[in-house]
Amino acid sequence: MMWLKDTQPAPGSRLSEAALARRFGVSNTAIREFLIGLSRVGFIRKEPQRSWILEGFTEQYALELHEVRRMFECRAIRAIFDIPEDEPFWGKLLRLRQEHIQLRSEIDTRFTEFSELDTRFHRTLNAAAGNRFMDGFQDSISVIFHFHYRWSKKNQVGRNGFAVQEHLEIIDAILRQDQGAATAALERHLETAHQTFIASLQRD
């Protein structure tokens, strides 16, 4: 995933299983399984007997992705409030909160670190639902929503700083056991991400 984010291949680019396996020193099977996971959300497609093709995005694609993401993550938020107080989840959430506060205070110089923190934040929330498919879905979401060629570099500091603040609103609502506020904060955050994604498509 980090390679995709860093190299930023354009839509229509071909991805070779063998070439990727050699690059990362893993088996063709491992690469194929990863690519199949991305294909399930329409990020790439396989040509018969040929290479994988990186797909472009449309507003309809963005809408469908938003709807599925909202369904999964709102379910996860509800499940969080059933987690016993002595479970490791709460320690993880407190550590995430501190990391967000630290990043917010240094956002001007560390804004590029947001995508990794964002992935861990949403993975931690989704893990509460105990659904193995949601974990795989989060991998695909991470690549798509932080795929730099689709995101304008303009105001990246402000955009990431705003997302950090939205995360903190979700975390704080969870910690004070306010399910309604947590759900509302999550829905606002997902809507922000959706609108930013739509705006990036319209700039192309």
For each predicted feature, which ranges?
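Short arginine-rich
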Residues: 191-201
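Short alpha-helical functional segments enriched in proximate histidine and acidic residues
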Residues: 79, 124, 196
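Short, flexible turn/loop "capping" segments at secondary-structure junctions
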Residues: 13, 46, 118, 162-164
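Short linear motifs at protein or domain termini
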Residues: 1-82, 199-204
